[in-house]
A protein has these predicted regions:
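Arg/Lys-rich, low-complexity, intrinsically disordered basic segments
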Residues: 1-120
């Protein structure tokens, strides 16, 4: 049977081993977290909820106001969302996201770059 929750074992085989439960999917309507706003400010961009129902955020240039990218799949988690559930879970998910997207997260100006810097 399909469960609506996932479990993750952190620090397997050590004294710090623990099991964390978290939702498989997240609500379709995303709320912008202060972490993401701060990261966007550091990059010199602004963020708003996306007009695309399949994405979380739209990224805009502060200088021109022009839309640069739509980032984050709606219904999926990100670092601030996972960190709110459990700090260790947030760190684990972040490190795995960065490994998985290593090839496309460094090219400035791409959606992958903004997703990495703002959501993770």
């Amino acid at each position: 049977m399909f469960s609506s929750r996932k479990t993750l074992k952190l620090h397997k085989g050590t004294k710090k081993e623990k099991v964390i439960e978290y939702p498989r999917t997240f609500p379709q309507r995303y709320t912008i977290k202060s972490y993401s706003r701060e990261q966007a400010r550091k990059l010199g961009v602004t963020i708003k909820l996306s007009t695309n129902p399949k994405k979380k955020l739209d990224v805009f240039s502060k200088k021109t106001g022009k839309k640069l990218a739509s980032i984050g799949a709606a219904g999926m988690g990100d670092y601030p969302t996972f960190r709110a559930i459990n700090a260790d879970l947030g760190r684990w998910k972040r490190s795995h996201y960065k490994m998985r997207h290593e090839k496309d997260r460094h090219e400035k100006g791409t959606a992958g770059y903004y997703a990495d810097k703002i959501l993770w």
